[in-house]
């Protein structure tokens, strides 16, 4: 698995660590985590740690498209933690599919700040 769910205690955010190429099973794992938190909250933040993002497999990309349509109105913020070169690549993908989502980059040293920012309940919804 190239995507690992992270234990985010906030009810307002889902966290993942991405390393390598994301596949269909990875996207299904994230979708299930999102659905579980959306039972109690209507809007969520996404916390993403990028280790070595290489994109998606074809099936992963198709699953990503379904993920986008299912959750596009529920994600308000995305905090991306990692090297800036991975941020630019991943942010372009997210911005293309989630145009109304606030996206911020944080360095690994700013991990705690990223967790606080992404889990703020009063994130502005467009």
For the regions a language model picked out, list residue spans one by one.
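Amphipathic, Lys/Arg-enriched alpha-helical "gate/interface" segment within cytosolic domains
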Residues: 2-126
């Amino acid at each position: 698995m190239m995507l690992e769910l992270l234990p985010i205690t906030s009810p307002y955010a889902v966290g993942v660590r991405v390393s390598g190429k994301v596949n269909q099973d990875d996207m299904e794992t994230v979708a299930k985590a999102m659905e579980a938190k959306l039972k109690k909250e209507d809007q969520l933040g996404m916390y993403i740690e990028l280790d070595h993002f290489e994109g998606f497999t074809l099936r992963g990309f198709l699953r990503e498209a379904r993920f986008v349509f299912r959750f596009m109105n529920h994600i308000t913020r995305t905090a991306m933690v990692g090297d800036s070169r991975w941020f630019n690549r991943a942010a372009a993908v997210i911005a293309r599919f989630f145009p109304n989502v606030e996206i911020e980059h944080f360095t690994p040293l700013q991990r705690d700040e990223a967790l606080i920012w992404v889990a703020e309940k009063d994130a502005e919804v467009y």
